[in-house]
Amino acid sequence: MANKTPKFLIGIDLGTTNTVVAYADMAKALSPENCKIFEIEQLVAPGEVAKRPQLPSFRYHPAKGELKENDLLLPWSDKLNDDLPTIVIGELARELGAKVDGRQVVSAKSWLSHPQVDRSASILPWGAADEVSKVSPVLASASYLFHVRQAWNTSHPDALMEHQEVVITIPASFDESARAFTVEAAKRAGLSEILLLEEPQAVCYDWYARQGNHAQAQLAKIKLLLVCDVGGGTTDLSLIKISKAKDDSLALTRIGVGNHLMLGGDNVDLALAHTVEQKINGDRPAKKLSTSSLSQLIQQTRKAKEKLLGNNPPENTKVTLLGSGARLIGGAKSYLLQQQEVSDIALDGFFPVININEQPVKRRSAVVEFGLPYAPDPAVSKYLAQFILEHQSACHDAINSTQPEEIATPDALLLNGGVFNSPALNERAQKVLSEWKTGNITLLENSRPDLAVAQGAVAYAKARRGAQLKIGGGSARTFFLALEKTDSGQQAICLMPKGAEEEQEFMLKEQKFSLRLDQPVKFHL
């Protein structure tokens, strides 16, 4: 029988492109070394199960008879309630989706934060044919967490995941509805007691834990840190003030959070897909790709991007656009994507070197053909500039500026997200920030940006137990309760101010409330 007393601290990075799990054994000292990546069992080929450090956040809905029952066997037999009877999750789902048109669910995390759709409705795969079974963004997210939970429980039958302390990370820019849908997905996956942590903070926790006793010395001359987390579907920005407490100990306080920005590696993949489509068609008039065909092409351009922007890249790699229907193979067309083309799009299109006063282009709508409301301007650099300018008051305060007429900029940068596995993009982001600052900007080392968030979630759980420094800053937003309109207009009561710390209570002693009996009421926050 499983012990319900927590034995492990578990951090889950529920990513747009990959899900990662890290953990620490509570029976051991909660030192930085006490943190491991949990390798997740998953299908990697039909009938073949293997452990991987990441679970690709992809689902594949096979056609009837496409895969044999034995091809889909996992080390566990439990199924997620209300899910489809036949699905593939993880590496095999990613590979099948790159070959078969219109049956892959991608970017479920981005859909969780899409306010213009019903996130509980069965809409994914987006744009798929009527005969393809669909699921909601909430259920898709729950299925990844359920898979992770089953893999963990199979490996730890005496310490089930639902009985451990679990921290799930989310973008700092997630609004309350997106956070609530994440909690709902976790509950549907069997994880009813979880903690949420903002991803940029998780990155900071991981960095601090890895530096150990050297952290204080490395941050001694730094006053303002920018955390730039560019994932598959979102860009997450946070400002961290670094100061000394009264006892001369280090104090880290989050002082700024960026708006929700649906701009990330997926956008690069989409731009590359359009480039390949145009090159293949040449001057011939071509029918616009269906959503499902575009999805299949994007999976291939994603792989090409990672190869051509990685270490020791080849000069080119082949990308194939499959035909459809009876012409699936015969109608296939290929293009040799050059390393320089990818570099031009990823660096100059998404991380151009600009003046800090250059603002993002504002349009009525962004790239929405793939279903998601992408940011209207593809240049991450411009949103970085906008974010820093919008937080000038906090920036000046953090660096103790005596020249308010000058633009205050961060003096340190911490990069995260799979995008920054590319040395070229890493260097470009640093160059962009350096152009805005007199003197060099300090780049804090992050050797595994694909694992840092999950590891940071574990470090946060340790910090809650006093094992390391805890980042302050509290709530990123102020919460008001809207009251009924009066002759003097709309009024509201502040329930929780921005900066409120975890478990801090606020008593509304001066406010009297009236009760309305036997009538339905709504509370507008």
Model-derived regions, located:
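Conserved phosphate-binding catalytic cores of ATP/NTP-utilizing and phosphoryl-transfer enzymes
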Residues: M1-K7, L196-C228, I399-P404, L451-K470
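Gly/Thr-rich phosphate-binding beta-strand-loop-beta motif of the actin/hexokinase/Hsp70
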Residues: A2-P32, R103, A108, R119, ...
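Acidic, glycine/GT-rich loop-and beta-edge segments that sit at the periphery of enzyme/chaperone cores
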Residues: P6, L14-T16, L219-A220, Q278-I329, ...
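Phosphate-binding loop and its immediate beta->loop->alpha context
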Residues: K36-K187, L270-T317, A326-K362
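Phosphate/ATP-binding catalytic cores across multiple sugar-kinase/actin-like superfamilies
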Residues: S143-A159, D206-Q216, G349-T409, R428, ...
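Hydrophobic, small-residue-rich alpha-helical packing segments that form membrane-like cores
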Residues: Q150-L160, E165, A172-F174, A178, ...
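Glycine-rich phosphate-binding loops at beta-strand->alpha-helix junctions
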Residues: V166-F181, G325-L328, S334, L372-A379, ...
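Conserved phosphate-binding/catalytic loops in two-lobed NTP-binding clefts
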Residues: A189-A202, P373, A429-G456
